[in-house]
Amino acid sequence: MKPLTVYTPEQVSSSMPPDLSFAAYRFLAEGDSWFTLSTLNPAHNSNLLFEMQFEQFACAVNCAYPGDTLARMCEMNSDPVFVQLLRGRRAHIWDGLLLSCGGNDLVDALKAVGNGVPRAQRLLLARDEWGDAAHGPARYLSPEGWQTFNTYLQANFAHLLGLRDAGPSAGCPAFMHGYACPTPRNAGAGFGLGPWLLPSLQAHDIPRADWLALAALLMHELGDLLEAIAADGVRFPNLHFFDTRAIEIMPATLDDEGESGDWVNEIHLTANGYAKLAVPWAAAIEGVLQGA
């Protein structure tokens, strides 16, 4: 197996750009922090792209940066480099797009809190809105807010695929992945970055006993939304979702504030954790490309 060779946009645009013709598969990558830095400690840093392996040589130009959300991938003013490489004067013909989408969007959307915020703009309910305890962690979810979130994701994927289809790589396959289930805990990336999930659960007064179950439900709901979007081939042609929910990832311990299980911090995996997802995802991608 051959590891994915990852380049930055700056390398590709330099006076001596790398020759991409060696690769059987040439990807343009964009997304959130699962494609960039998982921690500020270089000895423990990895990402999903670094752990991908293919049967044939493959390379990717990675436009992602920490904190990216799906909207930024589609807004020219926020990420002109990605758009230029996809459909602008610097565009290449790509064999596929690699996308890490939805995770940071979910984290951002969970921050909305309080009865003063309409339910359609909140993913979680206020304490006095909670349903019956018999419903488990689902009693904390705002159905109206999740519908808004789904509409938001769909609009952004439609925009992104529109950018794809306006350039020389029109119709090329776009590949997105699911996420693993994090443990809400006080484990950031250093220098004040994170935790990301825990503060929102605390702000919503979610009982500690339900943190793990709610985190699992949030990831399951996000996976369902992404899977449904990819399944709608009419609105979102040649978009492929790799479901990671059945892959066994060693969970972190709730009270551990450092590396724990397959997690380097609250929402980012160790190199070993990423490899558990990246290797089968790469195999699925290669299967699509070989069948094209």
Kindly label every feature range from the protein language model.
Residues 13-19, 76-97, 156-171, 228-231:
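Short amphipathic alpha-helices and their capping/turn segments at secondary-structure boundaries
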Residues 27, 33-34, 68, 99-103, ...:
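Cell-envelope and extracellular/periplasmic
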Residues 80-148, 180-190:
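Oxyanion-hole/transition-state-stabilizing segment in secreted/luminal serine hydrolases
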Residues 42-47, 75-85, 143-162, 211-228:
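Well-ordered, non-membrane alpha-helical segments in soluble/globular domains
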Residues 185-242, 274:
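Substrate-gating cap/lid alpha-helix
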Residues 1-68:
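Serine-esterase "nucleophile elbow" of acetyl-processing enzymes
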Residues 260-292:
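Histidine-centered active-site loop/cap adjacent to the catalytic His
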Residues 147-198:
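Hydrophobic, aromatic-enriched interface-forming segments
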